[in-house]
Swiss-Prot record:
Region (Disordered): 143-174
Subunit organization: NDH-1 is composed of 14 different subunits. Subunits NuoA, H, J, K, L, M, N constitute the membrane sector of the complex.
Protein's name according to its UniProt entry: NADH-quinone oxidoreductase subunit I
Encoding gene (name): nuoI
E.C. number(s) listed in UniProt: 7.1.1.-
Family (UniProt): Belongs to the complex I 23 kDa subunit family.
SUPFAM superfamilies: 4Fe-4S ferredoxins (SSF54862)
Bilayer disposition of the protein: Peripheral membrane protein
Function: NDH-1 shuttles electrons from NADH, via FMN and iron-sulfur (Fe-S) centers, to quinones in the respiratory chain. The immediate electron acceptor for the enzyme in this species is believed to be menaquinone. Couples the redox reaction to proton translocation (for every two electrons transferred, four hydrogen ions are translocated across the cytoplasmic membrane), and thus conserves the redox energy in a proton gradient.
MF annotations from Gene Ontology: 4 iron, 4 sulfur cluster binding; iron ion binding; NADH:ubiquinone reductase (non-electrogenic) activity; quinone binding
Signal sequence coordinates: none
PANTHER family: NADH DEHYDROGENASE [UBIQUINONE] IRON-SULFUR PROTEIN 8, MITOCHONDRIAL, NADH DEHYDROGENASE UBIQUINONE IRON-SULFUR PROTEIN 8, MITOCHONDRIAL
Species name: Mycolicibacterium vanbaalenii (strain DSM 7251 / JCM 13017 / BCRC 16820 / KCTC 9966 / NRRL B-24157 / PYR-1)
Length: 174
């Protein structure tokens, strides 16, 4: 007799859920809200004048447990300056086939060059398109920014950049 009651209880659960309103998410048309601190796609940030924050130190690659990041640093020159320090990340790649979204690379970055956005739509049917280079990772240029390579802001030092004392400047004066 107890087995019969178990079956009746199961039918009761099914019968009770038949009259509930269905929950349907219309995902592609209306994406749902994302948490504020969601770990989505990575982004390489820039200083307000457009120089890259990445100094090519490779700490993010060392911190990555999935070995998904490849960084090749190079030296800045006065004629070609991409970041305010001595070095910059000449090659920067993140393999999203390997990335586990843990955020350890973000914590390891000494200049806060690498952050994670709320973008989570990265699906693709081609595996090679999921290896993002600097062209896909760099933050877009905002008004007042100049695309590198260019010189540092006038009368500024590396420390001014690291302390956040650089403002977007009109480059017309040069």
């Amino acid at each position: 007799m107890p087995k019969f009651l178990d079956a009746v209880a199961g039918f009761g659960v099914t019968f009770g859920s038949m009259f509930k309103k269905p929950v349907t998410e219309e995902y592609p048309e209306k994406p749902g809200p994302v948490a504020k601190r969601y770990h989505g796609r990575h982004q390489l940030n820039r200083y307000p004048d457009g120089l890259e924050k990445c100094i090519g130190c490779e700490l993010c690659a060392w911190a990555c447990p999935a070995d998904a990041i490849f960084v090749e640093g190079a030296d800045n020159t006065e004629s070609e300056r991409y970041s305010p320090g001595e070095r910059y990340g000449r090659v920067y790649q993140i393999n999203y086939l390997r990335c586990i979204g843990c955020g350890l690379c973000i914590e390891a970055c000494p200049t806060r060059a690498l952050t994670m956005t709320n973008d989570y739509e990265m699906a693709d049917d081609n595996r090679s398109d999921l290896i993002y280079g600097k062209d896909k990772l760099l933050a877009p240029l905002e008004p007042g920014m100049e695309a590198p390579p260019h010189a540092m802001a006038p009368d500024s030092t590396d420390d001014d950049y690291y302390l956040g004392n650089i403002k977007p400047a009109a480059r017309d004066a040069r």
